[in-house]
Structures are given as C-alpha cells and as structure tokens.
C-alpha cells in the first residue's frame, strides 16, 4: 500500500494543508480523520458538495456518478470518492465553479 501527500488549498480562507493519504482511502475520509473540515453531503459521489479541482497529480474517482466527462477533463474531483494515485494538490470548496 502506498501513501501519498495530498495538499488541500482553500483559496477563500487562504489556507494550504498537506496530509498523508493511503492509496486505499478516500481523500475526504483521510482529511476528516486528520482534523480538517471539508464540505460533503452524500459521501457517495452522487452530488457536488465536496467538489474540488486538481492542481496537480492524479486520483481514481471511478466510484463517482455526478461529474460529466467535460468536468473531469477540466480537473474537477469529488473528494468523497477520490483515491490518490500520486502526490496531489487540490483546491477545495469548488462546488459553485461547476455551475
């Protein structure tokens, strides 16, 4: 099992935090376990509350059912169903940018 560095950037609050996330754990779950408060609702990849945008790195979010191909190509990610597959930087709190 690999562990990756996941950097979570909240532009609105001007914060940036880096956490260690195993490749078999969702980013949202790991962030919560390490004391970070990220937005979420369904926890199933079926809404957009937890949406973020990839700045760098790669994730596996094959469990999600909400984002369309264009949104995925634009770098949007649902943190509740995203496993890191490399070191990753994500801008959090991006739900409004989807619409």
From Swiss-Prot:
<comment type="function">
    <text>Ferredoxins are iron-sulfur proteins that transfer electrons in a wide variety of metabolic reactions.</text>
</comment>
<feature type="domain" description="2Fe-2S ferredoxin-type">
    <location>
        <begin position="4"/>
        <end position="96"/>
    </location>
</feature>
<comment type="subunit">
    <text>Forms a complex with heterodimeric ferredoxin-thioredoxin reductase (FTR) and thioredoxin.</text>
</comment>
<dbReference type="GO" id="GO:0051537">
    <property type="term" value="F:2 iron, 2 sulfur cluster binding"/>
</dbReference>
<keyword id="KW-0001">2Fe-2S</keyword>
<comment type="similarity">
    <text>Belongs to the 2Fe2S plant-type ferredoxin family.</text>
</comment>
<keyword id="KW-0479">Metal-binding</keyword>
<feature type="binding site">
    <location>
        <position position="47"/>
    </location>
    <ligand>
        <name>[2Fe-2S] cluster</name>
    </ligand>
</feature>
<dbReference type="InterPro" id="IPR006058">
    <property type="entry name" value="2Fe2S_fd_BS"/>
</dbReference>
<keyword id="KW-0408">Iron</keyword>
<protein>
    <recommendedName>
        <fullName>Ferredoxin-1</fullName>
    </recommendedName>
</protein>
<feature type="binding site">
    <location>
        <position position="42"/>
    </location>
    <ligand>
        <name>[2Fe-2S] cluster</name>
    </ligand>
</feature>
<feature type="binding site">
    <location>
        <position position="80"/>
    </location>
    <ligand>
        <name>[2Fe-2S] cluster</name>
    </ligand>
</feature>
<keyword id="KW-0411">Iron-sulfur</keyword>
<dbReference type="GO" id="GO:0046872">
    <property type="term" value="F:metal ion binding"/>
</dbReference>
<feature type="binding site">
    <location>
        <position position="50"/>
    </location>
    <ligand>
        <name>[2Fe-2S] cluster</name>
    </ligand>
</feature>
<dbReference type="Pfam" id="PF00111">
    <property type="entry name" value="Fer2"/>
</dbReference>
<dbReference type="GO" id="GO:0009055">
    <property type="term" value="F:electron transfer activity"/>
</dbReference>
<dbReference type="InterPro" id="IPR001041">
    <property type="entry name" value="2Fe-2S_ferredoxin-type"/>
</dbReference>
<keyword id="KW-0813">Transport</keyword>
<dbReference type="GO" id="GO:0022900">
    <property type="term" value="P:electron transport chain"/>
</dbReference>
<dbReference type="InterPro" id="IPR010241">
    <property type="entry name" value="Fd_pln"/>
</dbReference>
<keyword id="KW-0249">Electron transport</keyword>
<dbReference type="InterPro" id="IPR036010">
    <property type="entry name" value="2Fe-2S_ferredoxin-like_sf"/>
</dbReference>
<dbReference type="InterPro" id="IPR012675">
    <property type="entry name" value="Beta-grasp_dom_sf"/>
</dbReference>
